[in-house]
Amino acid sequence: MSDQQQANQQDDQPFFNIQRVYLKDMSLEQPNSPGIFLESEAPSVEVQVNVGASQLQEGIFEVVVTGTVTTKVQDKVAFLVEAHQAGIFDIRNVPVEQLDPLLGIACPTILYPYLRGNIADVITRAGFQAIHLSEINFQALYEQRLQAAMEEAQGQGGDSGIVMPDGSQARH
């Protein structure tokens, strides 16, 4: 096999690389401090996690995992933390049907430990007991979102599907 053939074969191989992981945005609100520190009742905690992806240029994608933690004591907000943990990923030569799961499962799985650490750190630095977010099965979350989108498409009576990053549609 010539060097040129070998180079061409390598150029066609699927490629995945993490270019950068970074904290894109983070906010902390403590609307009822310092009085909330005197409360003795156990707080209630609500956690929301969302995933978004966008193409920055050919083969370069940004994936953002957003985590929001709202803690209340009775009806008073003790604190609200929102963090956007992002990553830039170089993804080439991946079939379009595999790209969406890669962006919706593999990339968030890489980013989530950073998000967990950043949220726990800011909560502790704010003077509260650390809240350690539990692990998330991004495969199951992705499948739930896919199922919900397909049901919504069926409910609209159209044969529309999921719009993939390249603009094509996945149909079931």
Curated annotation (Swiss-Prot):
<dbReference type="InterPro" id="IPR035958">
    <property type="entry name" value="SecB-like_sf"/>
</dbReference>
<keyword id="KW-0963">Cytoplasm</keyword>
<dbReference type="InterPro" id="IPR003708">
    <property type="entry name" value="SecB"/>
</dbReference>
<dbReference type="GO" id="GO:0051262">
    <property type="term" value="P:protein tetramerization"/>
</dbReference>
<dbReference type="GO" id="GO:0006457">
    <property type="term" value="P:protein folding"/>
</dbReference>
<dbReference type="GO" id="GO:0051082">
    <property type="term" value="F:unfolded protein binding"/>
</dbReference>
<keyword id="KW-0653">Protein transport</keyword>
<comment type="subunit">
    <text>Homotetramer, a dimer of dimers. One homotetramer interacts with 1 SecA dimer.</text>
</comment>
<feature type="region of interest" description="Disordered">
    <location>
        <begin position="153"/>
        <end position="172"/>
    </location>
</feature>
<protein>
    <recommendedName>
        <fullName>Protein-export protein SecB</fullName>
    </recommendedName>
</protein>
<comment type="similarity">
    <text>Belongs to the SecB family.</text>
</comment>
<keyword id="KW-0143">Chaperone</keyword>
<keyword id="KW-0811">Translocation</keyword>
<dbReference type="GO" id="GO:0005737">
    <property type="term" value="C:cytoplasm"/>
</dbReference>
<dbReference type="Pfam" id="PF02556">
    <property type="entry name" value="SecB"/>
</dbReference>
<comment type="function">
    <text>One of the proteins required for the normal export of preproteins out of the cell cytoplasm. It is a molecular chaperone that binds to a subset of precursor proteins, maintaining them in a translocation-competent state. It also specifically binds to its receptor SecA.</text>
</comment>
<keyword id="KW-0813">Transport</keyword>
<dbReference type="GO" id="GO:0015031">
    <property type="term" value="P:protein transport"/>
</dbReference>
